[in-house]
């Protein structure tokens, strides 16, 4: 634990020799850009596969993307999202979620789009279940499972549990990728132990995974989905929240004497979210 420590980069006065792009220093870069995205990667020693430097690029407009997603998916569940702009405390938490996902990439973790289908749709409406699973509605931060739109107002889900967190698959990934196996003298000697770890998914389905190569072949490996073990049920819950969003959208965005640009933006986001929900259902039939 505590293997990764974050610090503010030193100033030239504090350390004249420090260079942000030095391969000895992993870094999170804030990019003044209109790009609504973030990326994570690494510089790797080609001789050994060792990661020498992890990099996270946070483009400024990622905050606009997170604001849109959070409002459209769980706005009815969180009063902080029902007034724009959202408070710094919430926006900071949304940025933290993205940074953590990208750090996962920087230490070698690929996406795992199957993880969100490993929890039953009704279970991610249960605060006690979410607490037992580390507070997250998906088994890994490396899924494209954004915010818990399956939860309903009457479920009284803690606000922190609406946002993905480090899950059991992430802990498994760290063990797989970074735990030493002292009894193995060669990589081949590790196989029996690694195969044993892999078989744990037979008992614990939330350790199962899929890869990018399997995209489109598994209806449980969906992007932008929550509770897609039953995509029909989870989409039904999502549509209920989307209807609530539509009912409050004008009140949240309307400002006397101001343009309707934000209303137009969020209305378009709602239509796009409807399309994603429908896509989750149609994936079942191919």
What role is predicted for each listed range?
Residues 62, 66, 114-117, 121:
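Alpha-helix termini
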């Amino acid at each position: 634990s505590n293997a990764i420590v974050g610090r503010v980069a030193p100033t030239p006065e504090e350390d004249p020799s420090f260079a942000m792009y030095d391969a000895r220093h992993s870094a999170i870069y804030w990019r003044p850009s209109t790009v609504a995205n973030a990326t994570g990667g690494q510089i790797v020693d080609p001789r050994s596969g060792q990661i020498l430097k992890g990099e996270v690029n946070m483009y400024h407009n990622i905050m606009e993307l997170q604001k849109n997603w959070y409002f459209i998916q769980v706005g009815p569940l969180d009063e902080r999202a029902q007034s724009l702009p959202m408070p710094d405390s919430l926006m900071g938490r949304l940025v933290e979620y993205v940074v953590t996902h990208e750090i996962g990439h920087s230490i070698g973790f690929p996406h795992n789009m199957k993880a969100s289908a490993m929890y039953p749709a009704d279970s991610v409406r249960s605060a006690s279940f979410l607490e037992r699973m580390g507070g997250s509605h998906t088994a890994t931060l490396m899924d494209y499972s954004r915010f818990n739109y399956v939860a309903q107002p009457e479920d009284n889900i803690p606000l922190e549990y609406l946002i993905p967190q480090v899950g059991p698959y992430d802990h498994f990934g760290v063990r797989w990728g970074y735990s030493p196996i002292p009894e193995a003298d060669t990589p081949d000697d590790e196989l029996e132990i690694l195969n044993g770890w892999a078989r744990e998914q037979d008992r614990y389905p939330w350790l199962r995974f899929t890869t990018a190569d399997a995209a489109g072949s598994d209806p449980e490996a969906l992007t932008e989905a929550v509770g897609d073990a039953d995509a029909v049920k989870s989409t039904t819950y999502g549509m209920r929240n989307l209807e609530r969003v539509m009912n409050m959208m004008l009140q949240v965005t309307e400002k006397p004497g101001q343009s309707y640009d934000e209303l137009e933006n969020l209305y378009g986001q709602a239509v796009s979210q409807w399309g994603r929900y429908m896509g989750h259902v149609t994936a079942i039939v191919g």
